[in-house]
Design a protein with these regions (language model features):
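Negatively charged
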Residues: 1-348
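Short, glycine-biased loop/turn motifs at secondary-structure junctions and
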Residues: 311-425
Length: 425
């Protein structure tokens, strides 16, 4: 396998070494390309002469799952490069990245998914000298680095211009010490979802106490599955005034039993909090009783699989249907049929933030086709085996009692016919 890229020749030798050399003279210049050796079984990279890298080196060695020796890349001239996104993604045998130590990264703006899936990588200390002043994007840089334990090389990174670091340490399951991140400048950080998802050894997050989160909008899944995380007091001073998404932020943090440090968080702009504390070890949610939920549209299962007995937000959100007594309601079924229902006095009922409500039983008072003619039956749009029959009572034995699980099991309805007619599932 061989070819030409720019003014460079490349060959893959019998021993699976990728050799890149100038076509003529002592210097060769690579151009942006679909790198033909991606997803191959090359084991080594060797540069001959001076090789100048292009501005974009995205996914250059993507899924080169047998690559172990890339030491020759230390000679690569990267002074023009500003995008190395996914360059070593999927290089699951790559352990030694010392060849990166003296790279000129002063222009680099995007390092997203650079080491994605580098399962053998244990330390990133060679990155300690990197000039990162122009970094903007750092999503998933170490995602899936399941052996990574030493991130001391990141201590002096200039992160003042980074806007997004979603998935940055996603499933770094051995990562325990994140103290090198304590001095990070996060004043321009906006997107932080999944940053520490699945860091199961992470116990001490005091390094994050100094983070500037004033601009952060997305925090969803940030600490999900951090099974050892017990103390979140370092987050008590976080400025969350810009946050809009906190979905599953602490989901399955099974050791977390005290959420009182979050008492003072500003949640007035948060729209999504579903599953936020799902599966945590908490028994009392009173600490967040004062949270402003005026912007919320989803609180589904926020305390599901916990020992919290009373959801403090229930009293803040009035139901869209009567909480007691019987009443009539409407729903839309398949083929546009409109069903008039009688919700009996003993029916359990629920609603979240919108107009859609749920109950566990109802009597069918009438069924009408889109053309206005009556019908005897109507079929649920979500369950073709659930049939409404004129004059009969239907029930939903699997009715979900969670007030804020708007799309959960139950007989869904609206309080007025027009809302039912306008609804599209």
């Amino acid at each position: 396998m061989f070819g030409v890229i720019g003014t460079c020749r490349w060959d893959v030798t019998d021993d699976k070494t990728l050799v890149i050399s100038p076509l003529e003279g002592e210097e060769g210049v690579l151009v942006e390309s679909v790198w033909p050796w991606q997803e191959s079984d090359i084991r080594k990279v060797e540069l001959i002469g001076k090789i100048v890298a292009p501005e974009h080196m995205t996914y250059m060695f993507y899924n080169c799952h047998m690559l172990e020796d890339a030491g020759s890349l230390k000679k690569l001239d990267v002074s023009r490069v500003y995008n190395i996104r996914g360059m070593f993604a999927g290089c699951s045998l790559l352990k030694d990245i010392s060849f990166l130590e003296n790279w000129d990264t002063g222009r680099v703006a995007d390092i997203s998914y650079l080491f994605f899936g580098c399962a053998s990588l244990k330390s990133v200390s060679p990155l300690g000298k990197w000039d990162t002043k122009n970094l903007r994007r750092a999503d998933g840089v170490f995602e899936g680095c399941v052996s990574l334990a030493d991130i001391s090389g990141l201590r002096n990174w200039d992160t003042g211009n980074i806007m997004t670091m979603k998935f940055m340490f996603y499933k770094c399951m051995l990562l325990e010490d994140i103290s090198p991140l304590s001095g990070w400048d996060t004043k321009n950080l906006v997107f932080a979802s999944y940053t520490f998802f699945g860091c199961m050894q992470l116990r001490d997050i005091s390094a994050l106490g100094s983070w500037n989160t004033r601009k952060v909008m997305e925090m969803s899944h940030m600490f999900e599955n951090c099974a050892s995380l017990k103390d979140i007091s370092p987050l008590s001073g976080w400025n969350t005034g810009s946050a809009t998404e906190m979905h599953a932020m602490f989901c399955e943090c099974i050791s977390l039993n005290d959420i009182s440090p979050l008492r003072g968080w500003n949640t007035e702009n948060v729209r999504l909090m579903s599953h936020m504390f799902y599966g945590c070890g908490i028994t009392d949610a009173g600490a967040v009783d004062g949270w402003n939920i005026k912007s919320l549209y989803s609180l589904a299962e926020i305390f599901r699989n916990t020992c919290v007995k009373e959801n403090p937000f229930v009293k803040k959100v009035p139901m869209a249907c009567p909480e007691t007594g019987s009443f009539t309601a409407w729903k839309k079924c398949c083929d546009g049929k409109i069903v008039e229902l009688l919700i009996p006095e003993d029916a359990r009922r629920s609603s979240a933030f919108g107009k859609k409500c749920r109950c566990d039983k109802a009597k069918v008072l009438g069924i009408q086709k889109p053309n206005g003619l009556p019908a005897l039956t109507a079929v649920s749009c979500n369950d073709r085996n659930f049939v409404y029959r004129l004059g009969k009572t239907v029930s939903a034995p699997d009715f979900d009692t969670d007030r804020f699980s708007e799309c959960a099991a139950g007989i869904h309805f609206f309080m007025d016919r027009k809302s039912a007619e306008d609804y599209s599932s």
